[in-house]
């Protein structure tokens, strides 16, 4: 059957720029998948996605004009139900065949197939392949209905009577199979072969696409539009790099901004603008946020990473003289930067400390009270963490940093740019003469903000960051705000990973259970028997809740370790022991990986699993100790001696943190363990012997599982 390329384009008003890539890919994928399910594609079909500010399109090669005929097998019913004793069709079978429109089919044409204990009747039918027009209509309808759109617009067609629901008003539809228009319709438009190019620079208002394969070429040459998202993105990146090299400056890397700008322009043109150097007195983060968020500009830095008074504009038009475009953008940015300077100057009229009483008026959560209350909890917890880490000045510094950490939430600058919280607090604190350690801790207590972000720079920042994240987790858990599925509105998974990263990467000797217990103590107002911060909101923190929070931490840790390349077995072997000191986990994992390379590893892991199962089934009393006088069989005596020889050294190696040695010493136990299980009956009829052998196995398990539960490594 002959094939041709297929082109589908939806011409619309400007689409949401932050959703364009997702929309374009979804539109193309949904159409291609639907056509494939209807057998209209071929093995040679290749899909090309086009997504520009005003169009979603897909080009598919090798699409059939009609799907091949298909043999369809339908299960009808059991033979016992469909045929009587004489082999004639029953009323039930007649009714079923009539419903399928094949009431005249002969019984001999039906197939009998044994399925389990029942013999079933099947009907084979030849189904004529669907025509492209019908299949494409179904595919386009499904694609429009299933696009990942959070909120649809409702608008009326030209007749003023019919309502249409789509992400933005549509203006046209192309459906071309080779040169032929495919007769489908969507969003109130019948398919044609015409589209529109650039709003201002197209050579003609209406473009005729004479063949599906000529779409991209005609749009670029006649319509002055680059329809492919990736090509536009590459063109913008090249323009940014060229302009940056010419100015001998650096452009800030921002993939999200580059994607957004790519979704805003049809034909990019990179230009350079400037602003008054006087604005550089404002912290550069403020100016950068203004340029990137409000204006979609690319700020330029000098060789030292300092912001300059130059920036790059991505224009959607390419005039012979770009002077007016540059001047217009410079006027706009001047106003924006003046606003930022005003915010900065106005904020500095009040100290951070003077803003603290106002935090009591800011709601943190309607069930948890105000930011002022929260600040008092975080201060108490930060001070405790400081005491756990250092009895010197750290607790007092952590207390002061936590006290000021949220004050910048009340500033005009953070109100305008919430992403600057913490950063502005640091700047304002420095301008007030606050100690540098405290100032940087104000900024750092939000870290890490995202995967791969830097950690707090000082121990003071670490104390406040841990306290802030733990307070968030335990408070929200206490009111039942748990992450579910893909929903995590309070970023609790990110907060947990932040705590985990700080404990591990900063090698902090604080147990996770201790941190959670002390955090729970603060929220229960039971810090060492003293009354904690007063609260107008009850926060019921129960032992079950703290256990649930620990489970949450270990689940996040397991997921993170798997993402880092550790196997499921390696992760389970270590985390099954619930090590409290998370800073030890990388060393334990390294020891487990070294252990698995030993020739004896597989046998020892299997034996450990066997020991674990025996002890579990026997409900062994762990308080029972080994009685050497009751050791009778040569194999059990040999195992006891081998275990005694390595136990002390293995324990000392474990206590020193030499986990590799502690595990590798177990290799000496392979032969005596194998002999024990070959020659000794553990569940002896003699109760004294049985309990003594179980005690020996319990001691063996305790020695083998100090670093990790190696039974988890068994195949």
UniProtKB/Swiss-Prot annotation:
Enzyme Commission code: 6.1.1.14
GO BP annotations listed: arginyl-tRNA aminoacylation; glycyl-tRNA aminoacylation
Subcellular location: Cytoplasm
Pfam family of the protein (one): tRNA_synt_2f
Keywords, comma-separated and alphabetical: Aminoacyl-tRNA synthetase, ATP-binding, Cytoplasm, Ligase, Nucleotide-binding, Protein biosynthesis
Gene3D superfamilies on file: Isoleucyl-tRNA Synthetase, Domain 1
InterPro entries per UniProt: DALR_anticod-bd, Gly-tRNA-synth_bsu, Gly-tRNA-synth_heterodimer
GO CC field: cytosol
HAMAP family named in the record: Gly_tRNA_synth_beta (MF_00255)
Name of the protein in its database record: Glycine--tRNA ligase beta subunit
Gene encoding the protein: glyS
